Amino acid sequence: MLKQRTIKSVVKTVGIGLHSGRKVTLTLRPAAPGNGIIFTRVDLDPAVEIPATASAIGDTRLASVLQKDGARVSTVEHLMSACAGLGIDNLYVDVDAEEIPIMDGSAASFVFLLQSAGIEEQGAAKRFIRVIKPVEVRDGDKLARLEPYFGFKLSFTIEFRHPAVDKTGQTFEIDFADTSYTREIARARTFGFAHEVEMLREIGLARGGSLDNAIVLDEHRMLNNDELRYGDEFVRHKILDAIGDLYVVGYPLIAAYTAHKSGHGLNNALLRALLADEAAYEIVTFDKVEEAPRAFLPQLQPAFS
């Protein structure tokens, strides 16, 4: 039986909120089978638990934001991406602010944190959402689509028309049947443009943004002194974001995802469209491990870790 996973022990870190610029303490705790991933605002009285679900995603303008009863947890996509990449089904995420710390702008710190806590299998079958007919959403020239595929692969195309981005490649495709999330995706950093950062700061946002946690571009070049972590780091980060955005559906997806200029909002609209059509998906488990898609096999976990 392919089993659910959680972490073995409690682990904690401190980082900076991207928009508030304030110190944020993040604590990850093991959770029981079937629990899912639950974010808790422990700084509120009483504390507010917000399950990571597609319907709980509210604001998507700058990040994926979970909302419940007026409480918010922003910028969840990088941590959710790491959980997807390591096959974590059940987890408590305690945070003492309204955003997850940005760390280095990628998912690498969260992968390290989860691996440091240890990952263990639980005595319940891992559940998947298998897409059985295509679902597509559009917004102008933007597109996001899920199609039947016995595995998990993603294809993403961006169009930024910037010298630094143009020369790195604007399309990337990855199939986790034979590719490592940790090696090929997790270290890709978020990116932005200097003039946009200044505009955000004028309205009280992006106060924690810096060259330490993002790739920053002016009109012509990259302002960071360090090299890109991948030759096509920009589009790989969009894949990283998409993996995190899609994981709030509640279970790993058995599907092929294709996107053109998609973002957090369109990714969430895609999940809602999928869940609204009961003929488009089914919930499945695998009693025999060898019958599961290769991307999710435990002995090949490094291929999706």
UniProtKB/Swiss-Prot annotation:
Pathway: Glycolipid biosynthesis; lipid IV(A) biosynthesis; lipid IV(A) from (3R)-3-hydroxytetradecanoyl-[acyl-carrier-protein] and UDP-N-acetyl-alpha-D-glucosamine: step 2/6
Protein origin, superkingdom: Bacteria
InterPro entries, A to Z: Ribosomal_Su5_D2-typ_SF, UDP-acyl_GlcNac_deAcase, UDP-acyl_GlcNac_deAcase_C, UDP-acyl_N-AcGlcN_deAcase_N
Organism of provenance: Ralstonia nicotianae (strain ATCC BAA-1114 / GMI1000) (Ralstonia solanacearum)
Homology family: Belongs to the LpxC family.
Name of the protein this chain belongs to: UDP-3-O-acyl-N-acetylglucosamine deacetylase
Active site: 264 (proton donor)
Chain's gene name: lpxC
Lipid metabolism keyword on record: yes
